[in-house]
């Protein structure tokens, strides 16, 4: 992705679980965090979602995980999280897909790893499953946490 090694695009987005609240990307500075782009209409998100739930529940994934609800409506998004569980620290709405476009999203799901300085360090295209987690994401998170 052309954005690897570049600053993550700034955003101010509505919180899906608290619609009166807006979250700014500035709130994530100083943390190593993941942006998981998903949608209720996305078939492969249903494949990926239980794995992310498992990583978070088991404590293997301790970092802040921001779910970017991409080109989707409020009610189906909430229904999806009720049905499949909510692994996210924050769920932010991107109803027009503009933030996703700024990140260079081609399809969902995609997952971005962002370092403490706000730089995009890695991108998983398609579902993040055990292979991607074990080979790429987990070792990178450990390295970035140590920086």
Question: Whereabouts are the PLM-identified features?
Answer:
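N-proximal helix/coil linker or "cap" segments that precede and/or mark the start of modular domains
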Residues: 1-14, 79
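Residue-level signal for well-ordered, solvent-exposed loop/turn and beta-edge residues enriched
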Residues: 6, 19-21, 98, 119
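A generic structural signal for alpha->beta connector loops
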Residues: 10, 62-63, 88-89
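A short beta-strand-turn-helix
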Residues: 11-33
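Short pre-active-site segment immediately N-terminal to redox-active cysteine/selenocysteine motifs
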Residues: 31-33, 37-41, 107
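Hydrophobic beta-strand core positions in alpha/beta domains
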Residues: 34-36, 67, 113
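Structural microenvironment flanking redox-active thiols in thiol-disulfide oxidoreductases
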Residues: 46-85, 95-102
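Thiol/disulfide oxidoreductase modules built on the thioredoxin-like
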Residues: 82-87, 94-145
């Amino acid at each position: 992705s052309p954005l690897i090694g570049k600053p993550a695009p700034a955003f101010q987005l509505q919180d899906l679980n608290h619609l009166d609240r807006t979250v700014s990307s500035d709130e994530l500075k100083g943390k190593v965090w993941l942006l998981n782009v998903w949608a209720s209409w996305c078939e492969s998100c249903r494949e990926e979602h239980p794995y992310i739930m498992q990583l978070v529940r088991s404590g293997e994934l301790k970092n802040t995980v921001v779910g970017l609800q991409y080109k989707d409506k409020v009610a189906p998004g909430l229904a999806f999280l009720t049905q499949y569980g909510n692994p996210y620290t924050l769920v932010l709405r991107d109803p027009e897909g503009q933030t996703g476009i700024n990140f260079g999203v081609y399809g969902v799901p995609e997952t971005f790893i962002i370092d403490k300085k706000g730089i995009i360090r890695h991108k998983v295209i398609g579902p993040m499953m055990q292979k991607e987690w074990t080979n790429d994401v987990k070792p990178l998170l450990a390295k970035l946490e140590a920086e």
